[in-house]
Every structure is written in structure tokens, then in C-alpha cells.
Amino acid sequence: MTPDLYAALLSWAVTLSGYPAPAEPPVVVIKQHAFFVLEACNDQPCKVLGWYSGGKNVYIEDTLDPENSLFASSIVVHEMVHYLQGVARGDDALKPGVAFNQAPSCEQSIQWEHEAYAVQREYILRYGAFLPVGSSMLHVHCEPGSANPEQH
């Protein structure tokens, strides 16, 4: 992937989300799916293709081709929105070994996902296409006293 492509996708995320452009772009790191299963999904099978876990890195699965696939580029835009959310909270400048300066609440995590999926859908629509991204979020809610969203 080219830095120009990532800069353009970050620009889409800024434009569609309303967040200000960050002083520094994220570092896009390409990873195999096993990384996402282990790190993002707590070693459980999952369909995660992109992940932002705080800091400066945005992780994208190695099978995605954002240069030639609208769906793949929309995933990068989605993760760029999460980076912008992190920058807005100050999570792009972290102490070593921590993902977030302050762990987001369950409700905040769900709100961020809704926001990122809304931007992803709008990005896809601007290209004249419809892909039903984010529908799994309809069944996600917070259990009382839980820090993590649950899907039912």
C-alpha cells in the first residue's frame, strides 16, 4: 500500500466524521488474521479485519486490498475513525504497555463503533454502493457493571 492511499483514506475519515485532522497520521500495520484472533478477539475465532487498540497503530488484515476493493478501503476508513477518536482523547500519546490512557466504558466503546460504522457506510454510499456494514452492532449492549460490550 502507498502512503498516499492511507492519507486519502484518513482524509475521508476526517471529512465524514467531523474530527479534526490529527497532527500525525496513524501507522498502518498489516497483520495476518491469527494476530486479530489472538489480540483483538481474546484467542476466540472472529471475523475482525481491522483493529485500533490505542496508540499510533491501525492494524489491517493482510488479505485486504484497499487499493482495489471498496469494502477493504472502507475498513481502513473505519479504523482511521477509531484513530481519530483516540487522538481526540489523547490516546495517541501513550505510556509504554498501555492501550488507552483511560479505558473506555462499555457504553463509550459501543458509541465509538456506531460512529465508525456510520462513517464507513457513508464512505461506501459516496461511491454509489451499498454494503450492510455494522449490522452486527444492533445486538450489542452493555451488561450492568461490565466494561466490555456483549453480543446477543
Please give the residue ranges for each predicted region.
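Surface-exposed patches in mature extracellular/periplasmic domains of secreted proteins
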Residues: 20-27, 91-95, 127-138
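Sequence contexts marking disulfide-bonded cysteines in secreted/extracellular proteins
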Residues: 40-47, 105-107, 141-143, 151
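Auxiliary, metal-adjacent structural segments of Zn-dependent hydrolase domains
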Residues: 1-55, 65-69
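Extracellular/mature segments of secreted proteins
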Residues: 46-55, 112-116, 124-125, 149-152
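Post-HEXXH active-site segment of zinc metalloproteases
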Residues: 66-74, 86-121
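Non-catalytic terminal regions of proteins
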Residues: 59-62
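Long, well-structured alpha-helical subdomains associated
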Residues: 109, 125-152
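Short active-site segment of divalent metal-dependent hydrolases/proteases
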Residues: 80-85
